[in-house]
């Protein structure tokens, strides 16, 4: 995975996340949209095998980098919770 910030302002950011697919981008988008500071969160992937996905976020009164950091932390927590529940279920 490689990440490149393509554009950044006080309330918008566009970043390319090379080597990833709809799986990660869709989960990240959903979590971003749950944050009240997020006005818009979307991603575009022109073609799954020849282009890299680009995530776009527009915030209200918040630095988009801070908002993405919070979303990633929440995603990690949700994955850890799933692992715990799954492991208990299969014991």
From Swiss-Prot:
Its main location: cytoplasm. It is an enzyme of class 2 (transferase). Keywords: Cytoplasm, DNA-directed RNA polymerase, Nucleotidyltransferase, Transcription, Transferase. InterPro entries: RBP11-like, RBP11-like_dimer, RNA_pol_Rpb11_13-16kDa_CS, Rpo11-like. Its EC number is 2.7.7.6. Belongs to the archaeal Rpo11/eukaryotic RPB11/RPC19 RNA polymerase subunit family. PANTHER family: DNA-DIRECTED RNA POLYMERASE I,II,III, DNA-DIRECTED RNA POLYMERASES I AND III SUBUNIT RPAC2. Part of the RNA polymerase complex. This is DNA-directed RNA polymerase subunit Rpo11. It comes from Methanococcoides burtonii (strain DSM 6242 / NBRC 107633 / OCM 468 / ACE-M).
